[in-house]
């Protein structure tokens, strides 16, 4: 069930083309828009540069604007 919330968050950011900051476990901050994602990776795009980031290396993803996520659709009861 946690994957559904993660998937909803990432998909909303991708569809709305919201710029995000991605913080890695080593302290590095990456910025860009989510182009695509799967179970293990996120493809970030910033201009012409693409970066494939493994999810296990990520600590935090911060959208640069508020995302409206449908919690019931994400499988999180009582949050809608």
UniProtKB/Swiss-Prot annotation:
RNA chaperone that binds small regulatory RNA (sRNAs) and mRNAs to facilitate mRNA translational regulation in response to envelope stress, environmental stress and changes in metabolite concentrations. Also binds with high specificity to tRNAs. This is RNA-binding protein Hfq. Residues 7-67 form the Sm domain. GO terms for molecular function: RNA binding. Coiled coil: none annotated. It comes from the Bacteria. Transmembrane segments: none annotated. One of its GO terms (biological process) is regulation of DNA-templated transcription. One of its GO terms (cellular component) is cytosol. The gene is hfq.
